[in-house]
Amino acid sequence: KYVEYLISTPINYTCTNLADHLDGEISHDAINDYLRRENHTPHTIWELAKPLINNSKEAYLIVDDSIQNKQYSQKIELVKLQYSGNTHSLVRGIGIVNLVHAHQNDYNPIDYRVYAPSVDGKTKNEHLRDLLRLAFEEKNIQAQTILFDSWYAASENLKYIHRLGKFFVTTLKENRLVSLSKE
């Protein structure tokens, strides 16, 4: 139920909010205990999502990053100051690069990476390429089209997607030049 809650809740991810929506079925303390006890890795997210997706060529992959706001946290090591597209400002939080499988009205997260360059030295663009490589090579995802915002519209990413034989849909920043020739 917790994964379903995360998928359907765009704003308030608290244990208390989930418990309120379960009409007393589960207490917020039980949810908190579960989250402290369990270790949800990208692999476990995939195992939960795999039976739910319609793995067809008509599906899409969506790459999007989000920041889990931790403005009051002083001791969580992954918290850093970073730009939030939601607030259009810098916020203290944990950056996550998400990969979502979309088919018709079904949206299922299938992978994610924590954006922590001080830990793994990777950029968000490198995470995008890693997520896509795993999706197509190891998870055997059949989607042909990848959607992402202009943050990921770097030449290296676009060429990588092209080499995969896939299509992309994105917006480009004003200062980007595009060539329609095959050069």
Model-derived regions, located:
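Electropositive, glycine- and tryptophan-enriched low-complexity nucleic-acid-binding patches
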Residues: D29-D33, S84-Q142
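A structural signal for short, well-ordered beta-strand segments and their strand-loop junctions
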Residues: N17, Y60-V63, P109-D111, L147, ...
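Generic hydrophobic, aliphatic-rich segments that mediate packing or membrane embedding
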Residues: T14, S27, I45, E58-L61, ...
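Short, conserved acidic/polar surface loops in the N-terminal third of protein domains
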Residues: Q71-E77, P109-Y112, L158-K159, L180-S181
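Active-site-proximal, Lys/Arg-enriched surface segment
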Residues: L35-D106
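Hydrophobic, Leu/Ile/Phe/Ala-enriched alpha-helical segments that form helix-helix packing faces
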Residues: L6, L22, I53, L132-K139
